[in-house]
Amino acid sequence: MPPANQSVSNGGFTVKLNKLFALAMLLVIAGFVCAAQSPQSPSSQPDTTGSADLIVNTVLLSHQWVVRDEKLDAVACSVEEGGVTPGTRTIVRFTVETPNIGDADIVVGDPNVHVANNDGLFEFATCHHHYHFRHYALYQLIDPVTGFVWKAAKKGFCMLDTDPVPAADGTEPPRSSQFRNCGAIGIPGNQGISHGWADTYRFFLGGQYFVLDGGDGQPVVPPGNYIIRITVNPPYTPTANEPCRFLEGIDANGQQICHQLPESNYSNNVGEVLITIPAHPGKTGVGPAVGQAAKEDFDEHDNKIPN
């Protein structure tokens, strides 16, 4: 074989091997540089400089709710976990979006690591056969006259970057999504919400509803005006199985006010929307989200596909 700097003739073409090798190396290096600089390639490191700040998108909530009669199958995990009697039920479905408007990411990481550490952040869902995040959001339907509160059927959450949040100046998010994998038993996940992104639970997903006809053991919701109240990262009282992760303060009874996720501001975590529940919504339903079928056989792990 000739030396690297010797000419080689082949079919009338003369090529310097050393130049060919150098050109190939340049192409490889250029490929790595372009991939590293591509806006579609998420950074391998989360942005933890600063503080996260979660809110509830009440504009989206006000535009995506519907009251209707809907068949709920016994095989749906939200039916089992919510204690709902299968069959045709009158429900109100709604969308919840929780943008991170802070200047740092919400970083949760792999559920398997948290379960191994027994830190109380996740619990195992026997129906879904994966882990659910505890205390991510609280769904309440409130009678504004009596103050009575109904709870929703949803039990589990998985935090992902599902939707970019436009900046105030109209620019795109500062970078691509970072958190795109819920994970499962033995399968690593990477959960969280990047700043400039939101985690969205569409109204057609499993558990995104209140049962209105008493089919979940709660009192029947009479026709009238009601408030849907969503609290993201709600406060909780710590227990032996759920220790206090981030302390906000002490209440009047001397109890700790704790949160699962750190934020710069907990006072903006509540969003409310006024809705009207009719007497007979029917299968077509009443509300701004009329016309789209539910996907009760999917939950947030199966059907929340990041953009």
PLM features: what roles do these ranges have?
Residues 18-20:
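N-terminal Sec-pathway targeting helices
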Residues 38-307:
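Extracellular/luminal regions of secreted and cell-surface proteins that mediate adhesion/ECM remodeling
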Residues 22-32:
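Bacterial N-terminal signal peptides
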Residues 33-37:
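Juxtamembrane cytosolic interface motif at the C-terminal end of transmembrane helices
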Residues 1-14:
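Short, Lys/Arg-enriched N-terminal segments with co-localized hydrophobic residues
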